[in-house]
Curated annotation (Swiss-Prot):
Organism superkingdom: Eukaryota
CDD domains recorded: MATH
Ranges for domain MATH: 6-131
Keyword Transcription: no
Species of the source: Arabidopsis thaliana
Coiled coil: 232-290
Protein name, per record: MATH domain and coiled-coil domain-containing protein At3g58360
InterPro entries: MATH-CC_domain_protein, MATH/TRAF_dom, TRAF-like
Length: 298
């Protein structure tokens, strides 16, 4: 396969300081037709330093001869100062003996967890990686024709298209509790519910005249499904109710306008009929006032 352009992946780890697991994995993502994931030791790996790896996802199921050559840059983001962010850039061969690379073992955890350090903002640690797949030996996880479509980024545990990340980040900033009660762990289900949420928002961003009753009815069904899954979207429900009320007013107004228009047309026709009748009456009155002719007598 040919060289793949570098792909930027973002992984936001919530409540980093409160994690009790020895190690945690990101959801898998696809770059260059290959599945990858991040591995991090939030409490260190027997030492008080952050360990962060880029790993080939599901490598145990691959054929023994698989190999992947990649250049990657792992960046632990300082959200207050870019200059203080910690980066590790390498170019490595991944294989059955070395399915993961990229430790940041010289990064003290006490520096990450320090108050106002900039690495934890609202308890969230942000990791950004740039990955460039240089060569793949063995079968691709995803064909090159579809890999560009399926490449995704992890944000708050949700797999998103790169084009969706900024919008979703803004949504979480404006509504930080939106997924606080969302408990599903399966990445496909998480992605599905997030897609449903974004589709509902996109629908409600249309003007009321572009929506019909079926759209709104399906919107309520989608909203029920989203809230049942644990999303807190009271603000979205208010918007749906507001749009429904506007749509009802619009339809009621259009119905009344049609009735008034029909009544007006009827009145116009009556006016025309009355004008015609008036002209006829005028003609008869004029004829009645005319002197009689005696030509038929004399």
């Amino acid at each position: 396969m040919g060289k793949q352009l570098a792909k930027k992946i973002t992984w936001a780890i919530e409540n980093f300081s409160s994690l009790h697991s020895k190690k945690i994995y990101s959801d898998p993502f696809i770059v260059g037709g290959c599945k990858w994931r991040f591995l991090v030791y939030p409490k260190g790996n027997n030492v008080d330093y952050l360990f962060l790896y880029l790993e080939v996802a599901d490598y145990e199921s691959l054929s023994p001869e698989w190999r992947r050559h990649a250049r990657y840059l792992l960046n632990v983001v300082n959200q207050n100062s870019v200059k203080r962010s910690k980066q590790n850039e390498e170019q490595k061969w991944f294989d059955v003996q070395s399915p993961r690379w990229g430790r940041l073992s010289m990064f003290p955890l006490n520096e990450i967890n320090a108050k106002d350090s900039g690495f934890l903002v609202n308890g969230e640690l942000k990791i950004v990686a740039e990955i460039e797949v240089l060569e793949v030996i063995g079968k691709l996880d995803v064909s090159e024709e579809t890999s560009t479509i399926m490449e995704s980024m992890d944000f708050n545990g949700f797999q998103l298209l790169p084009s969706q990340v900024d919008f979703v980040r803004h949504m979480f900033e404006k509504h930080p509790e939106i997924a606080s009660e969302f408990r599903l762990k399966n990445p496909n289900l998480r992605a599905g519910y997030m897609s449903l949420l974004l589709s509902l928002i996109e629908t409600l961003r249309q003007s009321p005249q572009e929506l019909n009753k079926v759209d709104l009815a399906e919107g309520y069904v989608a909203l029920r499904s989203i809230t049942d899954a644990g999303f807190k979207v009271d603000w979205l429900e208010k918007k749906l109710v507001e749009i429904s009320e506007k749509k009802n007013k619009e339809e009621a107004g259009e119905t009344r306008m049609q009735e008034i228009n029909e009544e007006l047309e009827s009145l116009k026709q009556k006016c025309l009929d009355l004008e015609a009748q008036l002209e006829k009456e005028k003609a008869e009155v004029f004829a009645a006032k005319s002197p009689l002719s005696f030509n038929d007598v004399f």
